[in-house]
Amino acid sequence: MNPVRTLSATKAAFFSAYPRPINAAYRRVVEELLVELHLTTVNSAFVYDPFFALGLVTLYDSLMEAYHPPEQREAIFNALCKALHLKPEVLRKNARDLLELMRSGDPVQRYNLLCLKPEAEDVGGLKAILQRMTQPPYAYSRVLAVGLYTAYEAVATSLYKEPEERTRHFLEDVIGNLPFSPERVKKDLELYRSNLDRLKQARAIVEEMVKAARRQQERRQSTASLPETPAADRRESSG
């Protein structure tokens, strides 16, 4: 039996895979996500499936959408996956394939599948994956909740126009058929959304600071480029 990977080992593996400094505004985001994913994946009841993959990809891409420099976003994602013993290319493919399955075909059929209705048409073996969630041991996680909701939202947007209504039906119709606490799922989704709002606000502040610094620099350059008045002209004007 392999020993359980420690958090310090996971952190060391991440910083070894990504030795560059992380943008200060996102350092806490990355560290908190790394800790959360570590605790999720070392759980003996953790099960990897496409919904977890979609949740992780959605979480990461949403939180890191405005990261600068942008070319480093994928490098950080790859380092996270490597530290967690996950394959980034497999994660992204599984997430992409799941979304494509949910967006193809009849939205009502896909909705019924997520609700585990007996008459629902199965696609991509998703019914067995969802049924597996009903059989203990199966570890719940915020990442899984985001993955389930993202898959659900791909079909529910055309069925329920209001966000509050979509969330209510998700908790009642999807989570209600799974052994997960609707209250906890709701709280985790709210936390995810509040984190996105907080990052957007921080990003707006940073962008405004950058614009202000740029304007100040332009004023300095404009002042420096003005021609200097000759001394003789200054004496004549003063006389």
Swiss-Prot record:
Pfam families assigned to the protein according to its UniProt record, in alphabetical order: ThylakoidFormat
A GO BP entry: photosystem II assembly
Gene Ontology cellular component list: plasma membrane-derived thylakoid photosystem II
Compositional bias annotation for Basic and acidic residues: 211-221
InterPro entries referenced in this protein's UniProt entry, alphabetically: Thf1
Similarity comment: family membership: Belongs to the THF1 family.
Primary role: May be involved in photosynthetic membrane biogenesis.
Protein name (record): Protein Thf1
Organism: Synechococcus sp. (strain JA-3-3Ab) (Cyanobacteria bacterium Yellowstone A-Prime)
Classification of source organism: Bacteria, Bacillati, Cyanobacteriota, Cyanophyceae, Synechococcales
